[in-house]
Amino acid sequence: MRQERITETVSERSPLKKTKAYRQEMKNGAGLGKDCAVLCAGLKTSGADQDIVVSKWIGLEGTARLAGENYERLRERFPARMIEEAAAFDRYLSVIPEAATAMKSGVCGIQAVSRGGIFAGLWEMAEEAGVGLEADLRKIPVRQETIEICEFFGENPYELLSGGCLIMTASDGNALVTALLREGIPAVVIGRTTRGNDRVLYNEGRKQFLNKPRW
């Protein structure tokens, strides 16, 4: 059976109940959102030689959609508890808490991750700031549920719809991570911005370049 791409909103026929917060995030586009955009007004632009911090996990929104729309198909391989947990990733879609904390903790730039996943988000952040970047693919945070469901559907988790995740830059990424963790928000430094235009990912010694998003 041909797999459908995730471009529609979550089906109301899904066997898993959608939360009010999730529906509101879908209405707002699951990006920074109007409230968060106001919060971040006046923020400095990312520059070279800054740490790159990622909040929570990539692929949250896409995983929630895939799990919610394909419960019965996924049950052929996975336990119900795992599918229900994946569908409940919608509870992580608001990025206002981490943006608010980041604004008080030395953040220089904030990029919402959404369409095209973390790969597109990193490229867009670097393009807008006019910088390059180097990042370690193994440090990019991803839930096991996302990996399993992406493998089932032949999706790339690094290109999966990723509302609920922010890319942030800071002169001291470790201090920003500490501030976020103190508020109960998972975060990790995955790399640094660089001078020049090369956007490079490293994976166990192998080097690859990020491409411009295809849309």
Feature annotation, model-predicted:
Residues 86-161:
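Active-site-proximal betaalpha loop/short-helix elements
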Residues 113-114, 132-141, 159-161, 177-204:
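Beta-strand->loop->alpha-helix junctions that form or flank phosphate-binding loops
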